[in-house]
């Protein structure tokens, strides 16, 4: 049997566990540590006290990254092989899952929250200037991921998305092949899908009017879904993707809560589609099509502890509802139930092919080491541990 046939067999969802360091607030309050990570044995131990008795629980994952792990450690050990699969023609999904404030966006994007805050203030101003559309915006945005480190290198805190982009183009540009790359970027907020790459209007009033138009989610007739009207941008190099990523990320909804100073209030899905034209030894033309879905989920949230009120409480409720549905889908797949509730939320409809479908999937579960987050940490660990049993059947497109 060929290696290609081997790869098309069913494979388990890969689950990584990442525990962030203590936050400054947790250090100041001397919060007890309840999580111990053993990266070598791929284990996470949780210590809790019930009725005066100490109980330890141990969870095993495909890979474990403790508080001292660097962004590059996670990427080099776990993500490089996935991106290589995309370049071979597979569809792959990587998504971060966990409580709010545990480092999902940091893991996926890197330390760019301050840049985003500046972008939110500047984007509307820039788009109102009497310049060719996007002229100054591209210069302003494209610099962020290339500012630090040696020329052509990413900053040390760059996350999965910029590292994957760089790997893709480094590989494509080193090969003597024809290729094309397209990207999309969407946000799911309160069960409404919006295009984060939608063209902006010069008029400020029109900008506010059109910036957040919800898009319909449609069945594609093949068991998957598509988003009607989603802008697909053709890109020719990594810098262009970084520009689009910054532009879209600046529009994502965030808010300060008691648990997270810049909490994502929406789920986001950044997709990269690659077509590669190759010639076989017989002189025939072969086209490979791979797709990489990079998902940053909003964090599950204890509404009373986060201090959410009114509109923020509704946001948190919608986030928790969609994540609860995701948990039910995981349970149904693991227990081989007859009905899997994909259609109960738009999040699970979007992720349908990534959970029990034709896509190779990697879940990065993020947790806090603090006792104050113990309940949410155990929930994340339980669901992530169960997700290891989900089987997908990847196909080359």
PLM feature segments, named:
Residues 223, 227, 244, 359-361, ...:
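Conserved GTP-binding G-domain of TRAFAC-class P-loop NTPases and closely related GTPase folds
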Residues 22-27, 194-195:
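Short, solvent-exposed loop/turn elements at domain surfaces
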Residues 10-22:
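Short acidic, low-complexity intrinsically disordered linear motifs used
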Residues 20, 187, 298, 366-369:
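A short beta-strand-to-loop transition that corresponds to the Sensor-1 phosphate-sensing loop
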Residues 1-3, 25-26:
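Intrinsically disordered, low-complexity acidic Ser/Thr-rich regulatory segments
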């Amino acid at each position: 049997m060929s290696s290609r046939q081997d790869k098309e067999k069913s494979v388990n969802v890969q689950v990584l566990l990442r525990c962030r360091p203590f936050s400054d607030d947790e250090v100041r309050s001397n919060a007890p540590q309840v999580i111990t990570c053993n990266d070598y044995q791929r284990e996470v131990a949780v210590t809790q006290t019930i009725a005066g008795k100490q109980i330890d629980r141990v969870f095993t994952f495909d890979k474990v990254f403790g508080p001292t792990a660097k962004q590059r450690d996670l990427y080099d050990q776990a993500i490089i092989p996935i991106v290589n699969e995309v370049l071979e023609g597979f569809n792959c999904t990587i998504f971060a899952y966990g409580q709010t404030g545990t480092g999902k966006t940091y893991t996926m994007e890197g330390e760019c929250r301050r840049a985003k805050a500046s972008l939110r203030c500047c984007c509307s101003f820039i788009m109102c200037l009497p310049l060719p559309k996007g002229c100054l915006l591209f210069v302003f945005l494209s610099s962020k991921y290339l500012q630090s480190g040696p020329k052509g290198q990413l900053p040390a805190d760059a996350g999965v998305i910029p590292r994957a982009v760089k790997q893709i183009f480094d590989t494509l540009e080193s090969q003597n092949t024809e290729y094309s790359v397209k990207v999309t970027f969407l946000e799911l907020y309160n069960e409404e899908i919006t295009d984060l790459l939608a063209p902006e209007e010069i008029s400020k009033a029109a900008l506010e009017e059109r910036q957040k138009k919800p898009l319909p989610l449609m069945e594609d007739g093949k068991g998957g879904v598509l988003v009607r009207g989603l802008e697909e941008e053709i890109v020719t190099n990594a810098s262009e993707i970084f520009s689009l990523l910054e532009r879209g990320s600046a529009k994502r909804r965030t808010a300060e809560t008691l648990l997270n100073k810049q909490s994502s209030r929406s789920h986001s899905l950044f997709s990269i589609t690659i077509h590669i034209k190759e010639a076989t030894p017989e002189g025939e033309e072969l086209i490979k099509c791979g797709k990489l879905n990079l998902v940053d989920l909003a964090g599950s949230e204890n509404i009373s502890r986060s201090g959410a009120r009114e509109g923020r409480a509704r946001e948190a409720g919608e986030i928790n509802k969609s994540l609860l549905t995701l948990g039910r889908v995981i349970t149904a797949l693991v227990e081989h139930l007859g009905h899997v509730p994909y259609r109960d939320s738009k999040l699970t409809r979007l992720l349908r092919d990534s959970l029990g479908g034709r896509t190779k999937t990697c879940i990065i579960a993020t947790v806090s080491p603090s006792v104050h987050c113990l309940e949410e940490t155990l929930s994340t660990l339980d669901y992530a541990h169960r997700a290891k049993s989900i089987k997908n059947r990847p196909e080359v497109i």
